[in-house]
């Protein structure tokens, strides 16, 4: 039996919008994912707190955007007691050891990925699918993170076929 493959899109979702939904539906199809999880972050250490809606409001906006789609909205990071992506992903893998996870991020995040805590550890922990975002692709391709991540490149077809897993 093949393991369930889950895409994870983390973020502030302040608010969630159609772009989050479109990216998720695209990734589900392109990568052959079984489901998508949206992790609504209690707080992003790289974003200012000013103007950030309460977690409950952001989770509610995410649930509205995720309706009638194989997208599960969760604020599990609060329960896990994690603040950084690397810690959240490690705990998710421990909690669901038979599940395969793929981290999704927009090219805007790849452009500044080196600012994330233990970003290389995230790449070693699970595959990362980078979704193009207009206006950010050049910066992402030229980023120090991309220079390091190139060694891990896989095609969407190899991920769909679970090659090397």
Language-model-detected regions and their locations in the chain:
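Nucleotidyltransferase catalytic core that binds NTPs
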Residues: 1-165
């Amino acid at each position: 039996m093949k393991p369930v493959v889950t895409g994870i899109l983390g973020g502030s979702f302040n608010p969630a919008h159609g772009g989050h939904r479109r990216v998720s539906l695209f990734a589900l199809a392109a990568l052959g994912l079984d489901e998508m999880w949206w992790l609504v972050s209690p707080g992003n250490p790289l974003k200012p707190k000013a103007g950030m809606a309460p977690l409950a409001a952001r989770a509610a906006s995410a649930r509205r955007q995720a309706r009638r789609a194989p997208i599960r909205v969760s604020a599990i990071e609060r329960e896990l007691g994690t603040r950084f992506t690397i810690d959240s992903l490690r705990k998710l893998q421990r909690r669901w050891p038979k599940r395969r996870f793929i981290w999704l991020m927009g090219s805007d995040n790849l452009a500044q990925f080196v600012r994330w805590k233990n970003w290389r550890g995230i790449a070693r922990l699970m595959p990362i699918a980078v979704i193009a975002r207009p206006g950010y692709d050049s910066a992402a391709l030229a980023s120090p993170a991309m220079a390091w991540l190139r060694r891990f490149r896989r095609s969407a077809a190899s991920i769909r076929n679970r090659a090397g897993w």
